[in-house]
């Protein structure tokens, strides 16, 4: 116990109170504040308990009716909470609307205040659509997306309004979208498509509580007829945005093309589809007068106001920015992979498009609360009619059995729908709306919440992408690799590797096979994500243990590299150790001199003199120059590896030593009579040779040498794309590819690099493509087909001496496609130059035609 004295113990000391520290009195929370602390969380979670929903509506509405209008604190807290739910958790809008209408029927002042507040919010966001000073936060979905969500909420409140009040807003928005669309009759206008699609998607919500209003139905039919007649949906096919090369596993569907048919189908047959989608809460709805109107007409921005904003390229919010390029539906869970039924509500239905829209809004607007997003997306079904989805966690085997017994039984899985939509955000081209880490960790959270239900869903997605690796976009392979590796590292590196054994056995001898390289990169990435080598090793069957070698170049090449530095001296293989300085190993002739150099690198900045280093190098030359084949090259390698070794504890240490010693290195290197390009190539070769077993660190250390002014990005690219025989690590090694993207991205914000690295990388890749085509020995007018092989085929059926060359060709072509798309703004400026020279640059016709098309498309992405 705490051995505290009782009050009586102080009775003898009458003055003890004078010395007791004076504590401030505990502040009493005002009743209205306490009420808000209890009530607002209940509003935010409304509808999450189906059983308590009716009671929640009753109790919350009574509290609001009684309290609204008395205290500004309560009024403001209520309105801001309602707004937060409406724009951050759109699946709950109908519940909030029901609550609002029940309140309105008994306290019209409160009801009117709520609709006025949301109308003002709508007007506020309309003004923000053309505000050049608009600042977007990470969870900002955009002004137009906010307009969509607020209009949807007001639409659910249709029983409160005169019919024309809402119809006029719809009409104005459609008129604006049509005017914007007509600004450029030959090309898509992103903002026009966003307004058109968003507004159409809201129309069925007018009938949520108002399904028997014939006047409303007539007005909506007239509105849809007007839109269909006056809005031209433009055909867009941007190959750069295709997720697959060649034949995709599913039809590419553009959201703007399906929204009107989806809405029309939802409204026919006496709203049959809506009756199956929306829950029937009319028994909870209290009578509404239906005569409400807004105080003012909504003022939309004019076409002139919006002319500089129609491309949606000003970073006005994550969802609004998605419309910058055509928006396609993304699929993972196809019917033929699960049986003769679908587990995801088709995008060709109103429900499918709406669910897709809601999940995206949830994921984007609640980005600041990832744990909440993980919970919400899997419980989306609570806010729609029961029976649309199967029971959570039901396996595909159970579904197949149920479906065979009863073809009318539900087969849609909320888990599949949520995961597929989030994967669509991860695999979105040309860029993603949030950092990848957010999406990856969100999926980890979802799986951790219910691993038995979600793990099989992930497994089916892993298998889907793996089965299409031959045609999956080059950049998307890297995203798939990242996602897969992060999921595995969070779940004990558990995977059914035996499923891939046949592919490894049959294609392991090929350098460019996509599936073998994926497995290799995956295992090596797993090793980088853990310090426990055996944890990964123990998870692998024997066939895959050969991929545990993380070396950038093979061991024999590494030995030859060091041997090339000497004449009359043989390098002992045991002396070449992983991530260690070879030159200080016991038995290496200049070991003691090298230790002097290492002592020099560790000296404090104010106690180092470069003349001391020069003296040590002079000593080295005098004593060992006779066994060194090229002393200039040797000095560069030795000094670079000595500095690299000194900073090998961490990247921060590497940066420190490189920055501390950069001037000394520059002084020494300046006296070496080699051209700059040769010196730089020797530097990066020395770095990657030291870090051969950990090339990711090697490339990051090379970046540090670049920032120190000892290296350029161009030399890094030259090294990465150097070929040994037909083998080019820069095309298949994930860390090298990441280094290419990283250095190109860095140049966008750097002005210190001379020359155009974007042009250099493009031309280097085209050169690799041309040499590969020459080796394939195809005619100029002959197409090259993606190899159609798999691990189930007999080995005799797939013998093809040019199989690896074909994979190499499609790898390098995919790389070209990725850089043109990823850096479209930079390549747009080079487009005319490329096109003018492309006939000579790329002789092969179909390759030239494909790349020419991509170059032209950079203007559209």
From Swiss-Prot:
Entry's Gene Ontology cellular component terms: commitment complex; nuclear cap binding complex; nucleus; perinuclear region of cytoplasm
Annotated GO biological process: 7-methylguanosine mRNA capping; mRNA 3'-end processing; mRNA export from nucleus; mRNA splicing, via spliceosome; mRNA transcription by RNA polymerase II; nuclear-transcribed mRNA catabolic process; nuclear-transcribed mRNA catabolic process, nonsense-mediated decay; primary miRNA processing
Record's subcellular location: Nucleus; Cytoplasm, Perinuclear region
Keyword Nucleus belongs to the record: yes
A molecular-function term among this protein's GO annotations: RNA cap binding
Motif Nuclear localization signal, residue range(s) on this chain: 22-30
Domain (MIF4G) ranges: 36-264
Primary location: nucleus
Disulphide bridges, residue numbers: none
Alphabetic keyword roster: Cytoplasm, mRNA capping, mRNA processing, mRNA splicing, mRNA transport, Nonsense-mediated mRNA decay, Nucleus, RNA-binding, Transport
Note: Present with 11300 molecules/cell in log phase SD medium.
Physiological role: Component of the CBC complex, which binds co-transcriptionally to the 5'-cap of pre-mRNAs and is involved in maturation, export and degradation of nuclear mRNAs. The CBC complex is required for efficient pre-mRNA splicing through efficient commitment complex and spliceosome formation. Together with NPL3, the CBC complex is required for export of mRNAs out of the nucleus. The CBC complex is also involved in nuclear mRNA degradation, probably by directing the mRNAs to the sites of degradation. Affects replication of the positive-strand RNA virus BMV.
Quaternary structure, from the entry: Component of the nuclear cap-binding complex (CBC), a heterodimer composed of STO1/CBC1 and CBC2 that interacts with capped RNAs. The complex interacts strongly with the importin subunit alpha SRP1. The SRP1-CBC trimer also binds to capped RNAs, but formation of the importin alpha/beta heterodimer upon binding of KAP95 to SRP1 in the cytoplasm causes dissociation of CBC from the RNA. The CBC complex is part of the commitment complex 1 (CC1), binding to the cap of pre-mRNA and interacting with U1 snRNP subunits MUD2 and SNU56.
Family stated for the protein in its record: Belongs to the NCBP1 family.
Name the record gives this protein: Nuclear cap-binding protein complex subunit 1
Gene that produces this protein: STO1
């Amino acid at each position: 116990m705490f051995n505290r004295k009782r009050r009586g113990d102080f009775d003898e000391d009458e003055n003890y109170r004078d010395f007791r520290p004076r504590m401030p009195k505990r502040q009493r929370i005002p009743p209205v504040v306490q009420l808000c602390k209890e009530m607002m969380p209940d509003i935010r979670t409304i509808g999450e308990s189906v059983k308590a929903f009716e009671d929640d509506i009753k109790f919350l509405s009574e509290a609001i009716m009684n309290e609204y209008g008395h205290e500004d604190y309560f009024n403001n807290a209520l309105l801001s909470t309602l707004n937060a739910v409406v724009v951050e958790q759109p699946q709950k809008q109908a519940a909030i609307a029901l609550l609002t209408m029940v309140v309105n029927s008994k306290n019209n002042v409160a009801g009117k205040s709520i609709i006025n507040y949301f109308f003002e919010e709508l007007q506020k966001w309309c003004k923000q659509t053309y505000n050049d000073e608009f600042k977007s936060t990470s969870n900002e979905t955009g002004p137009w997306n906010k307009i969509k969500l607020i209009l949807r909420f007001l639409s659910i409140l249709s029983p409160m309004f005169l019919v024309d009040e809402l119809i006029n807003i719809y009409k104005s928005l459609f008129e604006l979208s049509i005017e914007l669309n007509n600004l450029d009759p030959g090309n898509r206008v992103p903002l026009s498509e966003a307004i058109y699609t968003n507004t159409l998607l809201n129309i069925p919500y007018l009938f949520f509580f108002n399904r028997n209003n014939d006047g409303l139905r007539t007005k909506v039919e007239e509105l849809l007829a007007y839109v269909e007649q006056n809005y031209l949906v433009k055909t867009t096919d941007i190959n750069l945005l295709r997720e697959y090369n060649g034949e995709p596993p599913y039809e590419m569907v553009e959201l703007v093309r399906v929204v009107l048919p989806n809405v029309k189908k939802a409204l026919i047959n006496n709203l049959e589809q809506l009756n199956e989608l929306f829950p029937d809460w009319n028994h909870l709805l209290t009578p509404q007068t239906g005569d409400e109107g807004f105080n003012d007409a909504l003022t939309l921005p004019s076409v002139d106001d919006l002319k500089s904003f129609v491309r949606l390229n000003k970073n006005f919010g994550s969802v609004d920015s998605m419309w910058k390029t055509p928006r396609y539906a993304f699929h993972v869970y196809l019917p033929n992979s699960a049986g003769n039924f679908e587990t995801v509500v088709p995008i060709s239905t109103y429900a499918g498009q709406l669910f897709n829209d809601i999940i995206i809004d949830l994921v984007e607007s609640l980005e600041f609360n990832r744990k909440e997003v993980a919970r919400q997306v899997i419980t989306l079904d609570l806010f729609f009619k029961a029976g649309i989805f199967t029971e959570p966690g039901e396996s595909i085997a159970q579904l197949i059995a149920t479906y065979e017994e009863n073809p009318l039984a539900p087969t849609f899985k909320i888990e599949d729908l949520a995961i597929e939509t989030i994967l669509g955000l991860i695999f979105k081209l040309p860029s993603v709306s949030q950092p990848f880490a957010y999406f990856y960790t969100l999926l980890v959270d979802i799986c951790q919440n219910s691993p038995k239900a979600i793990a099989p869903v992930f497994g089916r997605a892993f298998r889907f992408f793996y089965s299409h690796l031959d045609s999956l976009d080059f950049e998307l392979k890297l995203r798939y690799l990242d996602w897969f590796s992060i999921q595995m590292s969070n779940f004990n590196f558990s995977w059914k590797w035996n499923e891939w054994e046949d592919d490894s056995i049959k294609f392991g001898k090929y350098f460019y096979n996509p599936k073998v390289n994926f497995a290799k990169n995956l295992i090596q990435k797993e090793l980088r994500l853990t310090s426990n080598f055996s944890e990964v090793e123990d998870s692998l069957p024997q066939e895959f243990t050969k991929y545990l070698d993380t070396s950038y170049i093979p061991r024999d090449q590494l030995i030859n590299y060091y041997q090339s530095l000497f004449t009359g001296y043989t390098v002992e293989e045991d002396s070449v150790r992983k991530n260690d300085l070879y030159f200080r190993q016991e038995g290496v002739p200049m070991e003691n001199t090298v230790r002097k150099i290492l002592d020099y690198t560790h000296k404090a900045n104010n106690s180092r003199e470069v003349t001391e280093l020069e003296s040590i190098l002079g000593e080295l030359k005098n004593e060992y120059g006779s066994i060194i084949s090229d002393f200039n090259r040797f000095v560069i390698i030795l000094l670079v590896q000595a500095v690299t070794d000194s900073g090998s504890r961490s990247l921060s240490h590497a940066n420190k030593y490189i920055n501390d010693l950069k001037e000394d290195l520059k002084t020494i290197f300046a006296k070496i009579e080699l051209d700059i390009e040769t010196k730089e190539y020797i530097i990066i070769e020395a770095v990657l040779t030291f870090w051969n077993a950990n090339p990711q660190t090697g490339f990051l250390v090379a970046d540090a040498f670049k920032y120190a002014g000892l290296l350029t990005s161009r030399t890094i690219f030259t090294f990465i794309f150097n070929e040994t025989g037909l083998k080019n690590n820069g095309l298949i090694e994930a860390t090298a590819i990441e280094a290419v993207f990283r250095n190109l991205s860095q140049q966008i914000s750097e002005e210190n690099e001379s020359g155009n690295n974007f042009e250099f990388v493009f031309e280097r890749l085209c050169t690799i493509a041309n040499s590969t085509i020459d080796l394939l020995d195809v005619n100029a007018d002959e197409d090259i087909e993606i190899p159609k092989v798999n691990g189930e085929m007999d080995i005799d059926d797939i013998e093809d001496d040019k199989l690896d060359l074909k994979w190499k060709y499609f790898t390098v072509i995919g790389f070209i496609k990725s850089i043109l798309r990823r850096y479209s703004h930079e390549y747009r400026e080079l487009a005319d130059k490329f096109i003018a020279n492309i006939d000579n640059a790329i002789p092969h016709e179909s390759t030239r035609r494909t790349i020419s098309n991509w170059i032209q498309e950079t203007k559209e992405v």
